[in-house]
Design a protein with these regions (language model features):
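C-terminal cap/linker of serine protease catalytic domains
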Residues: 169-195
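Short, flexible turn/loop "capping" segments at secondary-structure junctions
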Residues: 34-40, 107-109
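Core segments of cupin and vicinal oxygen chelate
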Residues: 45-95
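Cysteine-centered motifs
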Residues: 7-8, 22
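Vicinal oxygen chelate
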Residues: 48, 52, 61-62, 93-97, ...
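Short, Lys/Arg-enriched N-terminal segments with co-localized hydrophobic residues
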Residues: 21-35
Length: 195
């Protein structure tokens, strides 16, 4: 009896998964974002002056597991804009659900919030760093940079976080090396780990 119930439950679960996959294929990105937003209890909200859609499209083109979802436009004229203006954009960055709000010039981005992107090698580190900085962004120290909308990013090779987590002399050497860098140099961090 239990075995039969378990098999029926597993079969039902697989059928639901298949239905979701078919809906995603049939409805495209809308179904994916609808499914994601129904699951998310916490969404990062980012305030942009006016370019939330451009930012979301850039992130989707730059990072894996990233996409643009629903775009909401003003249904009528309002004090800060006109009918048809983009008000909000739903998007994901590396699987993290986000919500871009075109709120005007009142609040600026700061380093108090940043995305930290873990990378596996120098090529991946360079790719993300160059995409952000080369698209109107700005370099900072210790693996930090800003995109052209002022959002801060930490492009962090795993070798650095592993070295810092090791503690002791290895962590000190890696930390001291990191403090001299803008974009993280993986080979230099590996050399510092070895001493």
């Amino acid at each position: 009896m239990f075995f039969e119930f378990g098999c029926c439950y597993l079969l039902s679960y697989r059928v639901v998964q298949l239905v979701v996959l078919c809906l995603e294929e049939f409805l495209g990105e809308f179904a994916i974002m609808f499914h994601m937003n129904k699951q998310a209890k916490n969404t990062v909200c980012l305030w942009y002056e006016k370019d939330a859609q451009a930012a979301a499209e850039f992130y989707a083109a730059t990072f894996p597991d990233s996409k643009v979802g629903a775009i909401f436009q003003a249904p009528s004229d309002f004090p800060g804009g006109k009918e048809g203006d983009v008000l909000t954009v739903e998007f994901t960055v590396c699987g993290v659900p986000c919500f871009g709000l075109n709120g005007g010039p009142f609040f600026k981005q700061s380093e108090a919030f940043s995305f930290q992107i873990a990378t596996d090698n120098q090529e991946e580190t360079d790719r993300y760093w160059n995409a952000i900085v080369g698209n109107g962004g700005q370099e900072s120290a210790c693996g930090w940079c800003k995109d052209r909308w002022g959002v801060s990013w930490q492009i962090t090779p795993r070798v650095l976080t592993d070295a810092l987590a090791a503690g002791g002399a290895e962590a000190k050497r890696a930390f001291d090396a990191m403090m001299t860098m803008q974009k993280i140099d993986v080979a230099a961090i590996e050399a510092a780990r070895r001493g």
